């Protein structure tokens, strides 16, 4: 089988509305978030934003009741691969669901580097809610 080229890989992630990100943090400096075009579009991030401002922007747009969980998730990534789904307040679309998967990558310096991808998760959340509802209805019908 032939290997996928970079264009194939990019097309795959565009089709899945999945964007890449990298977070860098080190003592005494602001945390930096680096994003690709898909992630910028997914989060409504202006193109000319610095990595430091980008991290602040995304954190401010996470649904208020889920910010603490988001920061817990970021801490979790420092020790092992993990995934989270959270609500995000997009400046144009309104509230959307985001699925985030990431992990820490090795570093020879004291910097913490996390990498991963974001994906809009509205369809996944909708499917799971429907599944729960169907199971509840099935249980109710079995009790009749």
Task: Give the predicted meaning of each segment.
Residues 112-143:
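Sensory coupling linkers of modular signal transduction proteins
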Residues 25, 105, 121:
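Hydrophobic pocket-lining residues within nucleotide cofactor-binding pockets
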Residues 12, 22, 32, 94, ...:
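Functionally constrained cores in energy, signaling, and assembly domains
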């Amino acid at each position: 089988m032939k290997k996928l080229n970079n264009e194939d890989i990019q097309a795959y992630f565009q089709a899945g509305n999945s964007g890449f990100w990298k977070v860098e943090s080190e003592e005494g400096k602001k945390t930096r978030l680096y994003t690709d075009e898909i992630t910028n579009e997914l989060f409504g991030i202006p193109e000319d934003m610095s990595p430091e401002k980008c991290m602040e922007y995304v954190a401010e747009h996470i649904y208020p009741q889920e910010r603490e969980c988001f920061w817990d998730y970021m801490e979790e990534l420092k020790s092992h691969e993990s995934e989270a789904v959270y609500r995000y307040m997009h400046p144009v679309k309104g509230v959307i669901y985001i699925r985030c998967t990431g992990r820490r990558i090795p570093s020879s310096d004291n910097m913490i580097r996390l990498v991963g991808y974001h994906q809009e998760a509205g369809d996944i959340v909708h499917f799971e809610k429907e599944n729960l509802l169907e199971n509840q209805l099935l249980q109710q019908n079995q009790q009749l």
